[in-house]
From Swiss-Prot:
This is Zinc finger A20 and AN1 domain-containing stress-associated protein 1. GO terms for biological process: protein ubiquitination. The lineage of its organism: Eukaryota, Viridiplantae, Streptophyta, Embryophyta, Tracheophyta. One of its GO terms (molecular function) is DNA binding. Keywords: Metal-binding, Stress response, Zinc, Zinc-finger. Residues 48-81 are annotated as: Disordered. A zinc finger (A20-type) spans 16-50.
Amino acid sequence: MAQRDKKDQEPTELRAPEITLCANSCGFPGNPATQNLCQNCFLAATASTSSPSSLSSPVLDKQPPRPAAPLVEPQAPLPPPVEEMASALATAPAPVAKTSAVNRCSRCRKRVGLTGFRCRCGHLFCGEHRYSDRHGCSYDYKSAARDAIARDNPVVRAAKIVRF
């Protein structure tokens, strides 16, 4: 009960923090953390104080870097003469037009577009034939899983204990 009386005696009103205007008299509110400057004036002040030091650093950076070892440029092979290129083009077969991407189910030949499912056997299937038991998949999942487990979990054998 004593706690309740103590709460009743304390004032519960909220006080707004005092607003101080910018020290440069620009009319915006200042922040005590930035020496009572507004954000714009503080950024301008920090930019002006950091600019002399930034001017001296590029002068030092303008010196060319010294290479550790002399660079030796590898000689590129000379291109073959024009006559050889012409004969090579004449003997090369004509380029075959690219075939469009397969976008039909390998089982029912239904158009699947972007909704097709590519199986591990390498074929594309529709939603009905996407499972291996539905399309008679030739991929051996059991041996692939067995090999993956054997590869990822090598057998660890301790050295034989020699007793004297």
